[in-house]
Amino acid sequence: MTPCDGRSPPLGRTTSPFRTRRSSPGSTSETLSADDDRLRFTVTSVTPTFLEATALRRGPLRPRKGLNVVEHPVRLLSLPAHDRAHLDALSGFAGLSFAFSFMLDGSEARWVREVAPGAAVIGKIERAEAVASLADIDARVDATWICRGDLGAQLGMPGLARFVGGLAPRAFGQPMLMAGQVLEHLTSHPEPTRSEVCHLHDLLARGFAGVVLSDETAIGRDPVGAVSAARSLLDSLGG
């Protein structure tokens, strides 16, 4: 869970807010995915201090990449202690927003507001179950992010395309932002591709309130430049 500046579109890095199931020593029941399912592992050995796994889908594991449990549905019963500690430490600051990863139905927003009552809560749509609960989530949060990375890993590429293509952001009560490879070329280059700029224009024309940068700022060569380029494009396109 990452705080965002509530005064502007939250262009920045987010991290998963939970470790849903801690494997007990000797557990080998879980499959893990990393980097939006580009990599996948099966757990072979777990102790209290380390985990060993066999790669099912191999490749380079880049820094600052999420590690997720593949088996779903996974339901959180409460806010994890480490996130509660983060909220406690930041609750006195004004103008903060907190993005809640892998939100299920929006009820999780209450956990954040109990600890940080003045903060805005953003629901990250990253799991198949959230797609069916999108209206409920929208009614309980202050904004939603459509996170195409993890969501695409769950829905599959065609399923993701159909879901995103059918979205009508203006039909929802809260701002909706698009996340996941929106301006990915900025990760390694000073300018986006023409295709990305056209895509950004289409998103704004459809009613999306803005975009969320991920690799562009998390592992990019020039995070500040990426944000500046995105902000300039949003301004010039009327976002």
Give the location of each predicted region.
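Non-catalytic helical/linker scaffolds that mediate oligomerization, partner binding
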Residues: 1-239
